[in-house]
């Protein structure tokens, strides 16, 4: 749970057994490996196979949220960062949600939806397997820099990384 309003929640989701669909998990592990230092914003890191309604409370407490995911369109390895706002986009009875729907849940259930972006990396291969394609693997440092730049824009630079894992 994110208890600090001056921290940024990073949620990486995807299937770690579907090649490039796992790129978000690798971005999260790269962020987790960073040693605390001056200028590093406070991050709460979380990975999941899908976005679920139970995440709404945690989102409502963060200064901002970066959703990290793979995507099928675009040039493989291309990193895209787009603002996202609360809104429809998922079946309310579905087991997984879009970032927009999850933000809407946070707003409606807990009175607050944080600023949020979706950082996506275009994949090349989505078959069965655990290895990333080389072009997607090379995009990980760029994606990490985008996450850190966005977090600094939202909260400044309090040092530290806190990790949380799905229950």
Which residues fall in each region the model found?
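Glycine-rich phosphate/diphosphate-binding loops and the adjacent beta-loop-alpha structural elements
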Residues: 127
